[in-house]
Amino acid sequence: MEKLHIRKIASLGLMLCFFTGGGAQTPVKVEKRKEHKSNTVIPVVKGNVTDTLSLVSFNDFHGAFACDKGVPGAGQLVQTVLTQKEKNKNTIVLSVGDNFSGSYFSRITRGNPLPEMFQEMDVKMSAVGNHEFDWGLPYLTDTAKVYMNFVAANIITDRGDTLEWAKPYRIVTLNLKNGGTVRVAFVGLTTTDTAHKTSPENIKGLAFVHPVYAARVETACRLKKEGKVDMVVLLMHIGTNMKNRDIIEEENAKLLPFLKGVDAIISGHSHEVVLSKVNDVPIIQAGVNGTHIGKLDFRVVKEEGGNRISYIGGDTIRTEGPSNAHIDSLVDKVLAVYGLSEKLILAKDALIHDRTINKWEYTPVGAYVTAAYVRSFLENEKVPAELKVLPVIGVNHFGGLRASIPAGEEIG
């Protein structure tokens, strides 16, 4: 297997390979934009043939298959992606990780019908999210063997080997309408916080490498230099946020836009809607649970000796409108089998927990869940009686609460 050795960067030559422009001291230039649509008209370049390449992405779906308040569901997400593909046949569809874990629906179905969903959209690959490890490494490796093409440049074995179930990068070759071809490399990156945000047993035998080092190995000093590809895109499950001056949230990833050879960054993890540029590199993220899809458009000019590619605009598109009948039928079957379409009728009032508004606050849902923990503890026959007379406090991580409980319906 290919060995990935970590060395200290000590020479000026390597530093020049590391960064673009004036090097590590280049000021961070951030262009912040609100959600917008790109209606750029591609001008005809005399003597050359132009075309448009679109990168369509979604992230942090978290198994949100069923349509609910604020969650469009798998059917609408799929149809929104297909609509974009109809507008431009030169479209590559990508996931940025955290695909299946996160909903009760997903847990009891073990991620189904995600394979059919990915197949319908022709998802080329996925970054590895921290929640990909929730159900253990065997599930992840089996999933990769069946239907998921994972990319993970900064996850290696603790022996320094690359992974058997994921590649550091994957190259997609598209035959364009102009008669040419374009080759795009997608380098996968995962938040290094995964090392302490998931069960140690689930990542046993793995190591998480500094993302800037891993991306550099797979970009300037490898892919572009060897002339293998026309573009390099970072597909990173690392948080971004429009409120952050540097856009990228994690300290060890802030220099990624300054790596020589990086043409775009498609991000996930922080559940934000992001469309911006750092160091003239476009950065995008498409919310959570399929609420949005991201789209980056590039002009491809066919010239003698290769392609000239430039970014022409982006869009964060809200998922809405018609739903895909095939995917809806699969979801409905699962809902019927497990009784998930039935409504609770005991709650007289809605218990509100909106993660976009009061995620960090005391909420009725949080109180209800932690009270249930206390009651379960007190009613457990295995708990010694002397412990039950002591004060008992229920504690729940705020990230585990993801939805409200609707008001019940009166019957009879």
Question: Model segments located where?
Answer:
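N-terminal secretory signal peptides that target proteins for export/translocation
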Residues: M1-I6
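Acidic, metal/ion-coordinating pockets
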Residues: Q25-G321, P364-A372
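Alpha-helical structural elements
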Residues: G13-L14, V128
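N-terminal leader/targeting segments
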Residues: L14-C17, R159
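Non-catalytic terminal accessory segments
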Residues: K8-A10, L16, G23-F58, H62, ...
